Curated annotation (Swiss-Prot):
Gene3D superfamilies linked to this entry: Acetylglutamate kinase-like
Binding annotation for UMP: 51, 71, 132-139
Record's catalysed reaction(s): UMP + ATP = UDP + ADP
GO cellular component: cytoplasm
Keyword rRNA-binding: no
Protein name per its UniProtKB record: Uridylate kinase
Alphabetical list of Pfam families matching this protein: AA_kinase
Length: 237
């Protein structure tokens, strides 16, 4: 099964590679090359990017910042990542538009659903920045929301691990990977894949989620082609 329209969720942490902070140009280049191949095959691709490599609202809140203020700072961090991704994608020959949920017309278009869909139909990648524009909502929830709005076939959550495990594989060598999970399995199991709001939105709109390793070259293309990589979350077959 080949997906026609895909929403790719990238965490901010994924962009920093092994640096511990900021953006690794090599990672951006690698992602751009993979995305270029996928778009050339005819797949429509939208991206939601996080901002945790620059600023994380929850950490700011824990350090004493007002939670809403911290979340707004985090949203601005996602815009920095979105513009950086746009640059990398366009250098790889992929026409790209950035749309933000907070207006900043000098650097990006405002988020307009119908315009985003038109860009996708014309073969452009759309990178969504500034989360959903509201504090207290994660970028995972934004990914689920935008996927529903643009009628995406699937949400890809590209991460540092190759799927969903019953416990953290970095800490537990005996962790077991799940190939298939229902939305309810994730909600009741507290597996930490996405927050409950994001999972619930996907469940309500019957949008499957595929979790896979971003750093394995070609994985985005394999996921688009429907190859059995990572872990798939959806309704029971």
């Amino acid at each position: 099964m080949k997906y026609t329209r895909v929403l790719l969720k990238l965490s901010g942490e994924a962009l920093m590679g092994s640096q511990g902070y900021g953006i690794d140009p090599e990672i951006v280049h690698s992602i751009a090359e993979d995305v270029a191949k996928v778009v050339a095959s005819g797949t429509q691709l939208a991206i939601v990017v996080g901002g945790g490599n620059i600023f994380r609202g929850l950490k700011g809140s824990a350090a004493g910042m007002d939670r809403a203020t911290a979340d707004y700072v985090g949203m601005l961090a996602t815009v920095m990542n979105a513009i950086t991704l746009q640059d990398g994608l366009e250098r790889a020959g992929v026409p790209t538009r950035v749309q933000t949920a907070i207006a900043m017309q000098e650097v990006a278009e405002p988020y307009i659903r119908r315009k985003a869909m038109r860009h996708l139909e014309k073969g452009r990648v759309v990178v969504f920045g500034a989360g959903c524009g509201n504090p207290f909502f994660t970028t995972d929830t934004t990914a689920a929301l935008r996927a529903a709005e643009i009628n995406a076939d699937v949400v890809f959550k590209a991460t540092k691990v190759d799927g969903v495990y019953d416990k953290d594989p970095a800490k537990h060598p005996d962790a077991v990977k799940h190939d298939h999970l229902s939305y309810q399995d994730v909600l009741s199991g507290e597996l930490g894949v996405m927050d409950a709001t994001a999972i619930s939105l996907c469940k309500e709109n019957n949008i499957p989620i595929v979790v896979f390793d971003l750093f394995e070259p070609g994985n985005i293309g394999k996921a688009v082609a429907g190859e059995p990589i990572g872990s798939r979350i959806g309704n029971p077959v």
